[in-house]
Amino acid sequence: MATVSMRDMLKAGVHFGHQTRYWNPKMKPFIFGARNKVHIINLEKTVPMFNEALAELNKIAARKGKILFVGTKRAASEAVKDAALSCDQFFVNHRWLGGMLTNWKTVRQSIKRLKDLETQSQDGTFDKLTKKEALMRTRELDKLENSLGGIKDMGGLPDALFVIDADHEHIAIKEANNLGIPVFAIVDTNSDPDGVDFVIPGNDDAIRAVSLYLGAVAATVREGRSQDLASQAEESFVEAE
């Protein structure tokens, strides 16, 4: 199963927190000290906590669970999308729309509209419209794809959230809490760990650190899914006998 070592984390700068003046006292148990007015995260805590989170995500994936990757900061946006797609999961990498989880019924209607517009753009419907109407629908399609494209095939609520930056994505975390959906999150020294079921203390800004987290999560999810596919194959083999 995918794991991450102390050396990997040091190379990626996972241990660099935020400036000391911006700290959240609730993160004190995970802080090693400070250097040049920047908090240093205790990787002796982070390594086992992250690997525990990876093991749990592996189990969720192995039982066909849906994992929603959330990271809407510009620096993480593309990496979040790439990681989710690489393991056939789902993502929100632009703005989190309030009610995305708690008002799923309405979101489902918007997804239906998105899919209808996609069909229209491909079957020649747009070509039959006036230029103005075609432009309006193209803009609507782009807007919906931007906000819902990563969840349009999710088919229901996710079984877990993996979040880059608990502070920035606090609305998503609160919605997951309300619905009892487990939250796995990167929590930096300026963030509140409350509401996060699997806290991963670490740098949430450095792209190398973000890439490390996402790469490991995607790998463990792929492994979990392959276990599920292997067990399905075994079952069908037994039935065939």
UniProtKB/Swiss-Prot annotation:
This is Small ribosomal subunit protein uS2. Belongs to the universal ribosomal protein uS2 family. It holds the Pfam family Ribosomal_S2. GO terms for molecular function: structural constituent of ribosome. InterPro entries: Ribosomal_uS2, Ribosomal_uS2_bac/mit/plastid, Ribosomal_uS2_CS, Ribosomal_uS2_flav_dom_sf. GO terms for cellular component: cytosolic small ribosomal subunit. Disulfide bonds: none annotated. One of its GO terms (biological process) is translation. PANTHER family: 30S RIBOSOMAL PROTEIN S2 PROKARYOTIC AND ORGANELLAR, SMALL RIBOSOMAL SUBUNIT PROTEIN US2M. It comes from the Bacteria. The keyword Ribosomal protein applies. Keywords: Ribonucleoprotein, Ribosomal protein.
